[in-house]
Design a protein with these regions (language model features):
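Flexible, D/E/H-enriched segments
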Residues: 1-50, 62-165, 176, 198-296, ...
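Glycine-rich beta-alpha junction loops
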Residues: 12, 189-190
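Beta-strand elements within well-structured catalytic alpha/beta cores of enzymes
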Residues: 50-56, 148, 181-189
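Non-transmembrane, aqueous-exposed alpha-helical and coiled segments at domain scale
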Residues: 153, 168-183
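Divalent-metal (often Zn2+) His-rich catalytic cores of metallo-beta-lactamase-fold enzymes
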Residues: 189, 195-199
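Intrinsically disordered, low-complexity proline-rich regions
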Residues: 296, 303-305
Length: 312
């Protein structure tokens, strides 16, 4: 049977893609950021995933405001990139695994998630930048992918609770797949940032560091945030943390943090990176399934609310 070998959360800032295209990995401004990924490359060499489930948010390349599904899953044999207008070069297509994707889709629907199925799917920088960061060498790009797009732009957005539960359903789907493959779950986006309005340039370091700690040790508490709480504390585009919730939900309750970094100077987005490994595998992770995680949306009104006034 398939198993989840780990999860990675990483930012997907478009300027990273431009830096990669221009070979700036050793530029003094960029080097501290790119050096943070070297331990991840070593870890990936060690665990050798057979497939990557990539949870990201589309920015208007495949979906737009007139048609924006809450959750969409790719079921194609390949996923093409296209010009988004950011000045990023178009990259070569990524391989898919339709058989796995259809199993994932059918399992999620049986788990009462209404999924938009995409037999053709363009993937934007939120997908391609993380893949380029994690597998920078062309020969490493053979890992098949299953993209999952989460709505983070068109009201109403899915709640952190819903995204965390989606992750749990993805974990169940993976571990019910009959092939013996090692699956990596990647959540892209974040951390805190706001690109427009009165708070343009907003970064909340204290909240970001709280997220990096709680996503490991207490994801259920973090998932109690409402979307409005996330916008308040992480900025309008900081809601991309929803993809981190999906990734964490696909992991077991107990995880081991293998690596994390936090870096701000490359852009007006706080860049986060985290690698997690499951402490348990297989059926052990679902022993508590009968006591399904149930939390409601609520506005956080405790000392944590003070972090909304802290900026880097």
């Amino acid at each position: 049977m398939a198993r989840v070998i780990g999860g990675i959360a990483t930012s997907h800032v478009p300027s990273i893609g431009k830096a990669i295209a221009r070979g700036w990995e050793n530029d003094p401004h960029w080097k501290p950021f790119f050096d943070g990924y070297k331990p991840v490359h070593a870890w990936l060499d060690e665990v050798q995933p057979d497939l990557a489930v990539v949870v990201y948010n589309d920015h208007g390349l495949n979906f737009f405001l007139d048609k924006m599904p809450t959750f969409a899953v790719g079921a194609a044999s390949q996923y093409k990139n296209a010009d988004e207008g950011w000045g990023l070069p178009v990259v070569a297509p990524y391989s898919g695994d339709p058989r796995f994707s259809w199993h994932l889709i059918e399992s999620l629907v049986a788990d009462e998630f209404d999924i938009t199925t995409c037999q053709e799917m363009l993937v934007d920088h939120a997908f391609t930048v993380p893949m380029s960061l994690l597998w920078p060498k062309p020969e490493w790009r053979a890992v098949p992918t299953a993209p999952i797009s989460i709505n983070t732009v068109q009201y109403p957005l899915p709640t952190p609770t819903r995204c965390y539960k989606l992750g749990k359903a993805i974990g169940r789907a993976i571990e019910s797949y009959e092939e013996d493959i090692r699956v990596l779950v990647i959540g892209t986006g974040g951390l805190s940032h706001q690109l427009d309005g009165e708070r343009a340039g907003y970064i909340n370091k204290k909240f970001d560091l709280l997220c990096l700690e709680q996503i490991v040790n207490d994801p259920e508490e973090l998932a109690r945030y409402s979307v409005h709480d996330l916008v308040r504390d992480a900025g309008a585009q900081g809601v991309e943390l929803l993809m981190w919730f999906v990734m964490r939900g696909a992991m077991t309750g107990q995880v081991t943090e293998k690596h994390h970094t936090y870096h701000v100077p490359i852009s007006n987005t706080a860049a986060g990176l985290m690698v997690l490994e499951n402490k348990t595998q297989g059926n052990d992770r679902w022993l508590a399934q009968d006591k399904e995680f149930e939390i409601g949306r609520k506005s956080i009104s405790n000392p944590k609310s003070e972090i909304s006034n802290w900026t880097a």
